[in-house]
Amino acid sequence: MMPNSRSATITPTTESTTTTTTTTTTLTTSYWCYSCTRFISVWEDQDANAGVLCPYCNGGFIEEIEDSSNSTVAAIPASTPEVRSVEETHRSIIRRRRSNRRTSFNPVIVLHGGGGGGAGERVENEEGDGATRERRAYEFYYDDGSGSGLRPLPDSVSEILMGSGFERLLEQLSQIEASGNGIGRSGNPPASKSAIESLPRVEISDCHTKAEANCAVCTEVFEAGIEGREMPCKHIFHGDCIVPWLSIRNSCPVCRFELPSDPIQRSNEEEHAVGMTIWRLPGGGFAVGRFNAGVREGERILPVVLTEMDGGGLGSNEGPRRISWVRAHETPEMSRNGGRSGNGGRLRRAVRGMVSFMRRVRPSRGSSNSNVIDLDSDGETRVMNRSTSLIRRFF
């Protein structure tokens, strides 16, 4: 149960036969820091009679996490190929994170459980002691960065996370999956190549600028005399803006007029989502990455990002505005060029256009700490704060 006072201090269990002050140097089990909203590992190199402090915020508002063997959460079924894929992807993420600067937060791994809703059926524990547990729609795991691997998340911490907006986020992601779009896919399919190429090229004149002064994708003012592309709905855009946009979704950014799209064919294996990784961003909101059983070698799923200001926990009745990316295919040519290929260039242009448009439509909270997306030259995605980097190369 979460303490009801932020000044509360949870001290570790220590053994002492005398009243003499002693000093210990041992690595403790995991702790949950309520102030940082993250898991921590603490070196007890201090007065044994003093409380353990979080190394990030230097606060004592922490709770020791019980050993996973005592948890009622089911252990990861390591025999399945899907879970082996999740663990290998997770280890790769951890290796990349450790090679970069020390981050101030860590992810929660969410796997699809056997339950179909909020309250699952009762099943017998694996220990064979006759006790039962509730099979949940989602199973939560975490890694505290100590090298011990994934552990089941204790029920008490799961309840805290669900109460902080995770439950609503998971419901939204489930609705996206059920609608057939999938996590990381846009609501509209990409426009067909022939439809994009058939868009007429027009020279922007004063007549055009009187009707539309700005490109709706990048929001920049049109300059008379430059070339633009005209949609069938008669809306005008920069060619470098509307082509990447239509390569992601087939609708007009202004009126939602839809261009023809190619039939989408996906195998059942490719559609099977095993689980996801959720980052609680310090500035508010979440970043979500999906583990997929059908991911081919050299292929990555770039994350969908939902922010609290867009329906991630502020009580808005609107659906979440989300930035959705397609699969990133890494070819031998991209590997040799460090990820700089023609496809990579087009993806980066699409990112710039999407970010510019999302900046325009995203409601403001009166703060300069809104989140934007940045695509590194090597094709990796980061969620950025306008003043501080929040996520460092997590895929």
Swiss-Prot record:
Induction details: Induced by abscisic acid (ABA), and drought and salt stresses.
Zinc finger (RING-type): 215-256
EC number(s) stated in the UniProt entry for this protein: 2.3.2.27
Any one annotated GO CC term: nucleus
Pfam families xref list: DUF1117 (PF06547), zf-RING_2 (PF13639), Zn_ribbon_19 (PF14369)
Chain intervals for the UniProt region annotation (Disordered): 1-22, 107-130
Annotated localization: Cytoplasm, Cytosol; Nucleus
Keywords, alphabetical: Abscisic acid signaling pathway, Cytoplasm, Metal-binding, Nucleus, Stress response, Transferase, Ubl conjugation pathway, Zinc, Zinc-finger
Catalytic activity: S-ubiquitinyl-[E2 ubiquitin-conjugating enzyme]-L-cysteine + [acceptor protein]-L-lysine = [E2 ubiquitin-conjugating enzyme]-L-cysteine + N(6)-ubiquitinyl-[acceptor protein]-L-lysine
Keyword Signal: no
Biased composition (Low complexity): 9-22
Pathway the protein contributes to: Protein modification; protein ubiquitination
InterPro entries assigned: DUF1117, RNF126-like_zinc-ribbon, Znf_RING, Znf_RING/FYVE/PHD
One annotated GO biological process: abscisic acid-activated signaling pathway
Tissue: Expressed in root tips, leaf tips, junction of carpels and pedicels, stigma, anthers, pollen, vasculature of sepals and petals, immature seeds and embryos.
Main location: cytoplasm
GO terms for MF: ubiquitin protein ligase activity; ubiquitin-protein transferase activity; zinc ion binding
Changes seen on gene knockout: No visible phenotype under normal growth conditions. Mutant plants have decreased sensitivity to abscisic acid (ABA) and reduced tolerance to drought stress.
Enzyme class: transferase
Biased composition (Basic and acidic residues): 121-130
UniProt function note: E3 ubiquitin-protein ligase involved in the positive regulation of abscisic acid-dependent drought stress responses. Involved in the positive regulation of responses to salt and osmotic stresses during seed germination and early seedling development. Possesses E3 ubiquitin ligase activity in vitro.
PANTHER family attached to this UniProt entry: E3 UBIQUITIN-PROTEIN LIGASE PRAJA, E3 UBIQUITIN-PROTEIN LIGASE RDUF1
Protein name as it appears in the record: E3 ubiquitin-protein ligase RDUF1
Lineage of the organism: Eukaryota, Viridiplantae, Streptophyta, Embryophyta, Tracheophyta
